[in-house]
């Protein structure tokens, strides 16, 4: 290596996996400095993405009331095509979290009503905690009286500034039952409750964004003028987070993480009304494309958005007669996870994620890629291994 120009050495290092690069840091100060450089880390991640094969992470998750106390393995990476998983040790082994379904640059975001939120790189084990939002603090009181919220945290990246942002978007009625006269609230909570109660009269939603620089949450004004569907996971694609809207027709709502503005994406072929839209429509990121999966028996069709021409194209059609014979009958749409080997679709059983299936559109075949042989409360998600952290 000493005989090679250093730019050639960097070119070689960029193509190594993260585990090898972590070992290479001990070779020399120059190598260590290179591997710690953000520009190098971004190039390494780009090469990883070009492999077209993300890794699969299994995260033990909390139920809605955080009742499950026993946790065996908080995080595991899966070996597809087998029943093998590799445990990832974490400092929070005794605490259950919920997880954002969209990873970003190899980072995963975990959140909890009763403990600090966490951004973690499961490959390097780096993690950073950040505080509860206003919504989470107030939602904690809702849990105490038996009410359960359905809003879910989004996580993505401002592509212009390169900053990462956790985002809450929730309908104004979500915390409508709060009373700022309650003695359990502190002054800050009472002020926020008063603001939310006043806002309920003239706004559809509230939006909160966390700034890792100031280490604080702030409200985005104006928030979305459209209410969003319950129980859906925000999806990150290309600098924006996305939700499905509520109403007689279902639209795709986009939040630009740089401009921090909302807009409705072009008209979609699934605009007709769904009686149980949160069950029949699932939004996802497949190969860095915004996709919507629509269940209409006997098929589940997956549409992909062409961001340049603002048009939708059907890219997959899943035969529900076949999958129901494998998974059993279920009222929910199957959950797409990622694309492997350029065009094979990986998806999972919708409620528990305990069985992973691959669909090959060329041969129209289906086969199990991972099966659990005991009950699980963990959810799978796809990510690309990286060296990225949040400074």
UniProtKB/Swiss-Prot annotation:
Residues 1-43 form the F-box domain. PANTHER family: BNACNNG10540D PROTEIN, F-BOX PROTEIN CPR30-LIKE. InterPro entries: F-box-assoc_dom_typ1, F-box-assoc_interact_dom, F-box-like_dom_sf, F-box_dom, Gal_Oxase/kelch_b-propeller, SCF_F-box_component. The lineage of its organism: Eukaryota, Viridiplantae, Streptophyta, Embryophyta, Tracheophyta. It comes from Arabidopsis thaliana. This is F-box protein At2g34280. NCBIfam families: F_box_assoc_1.
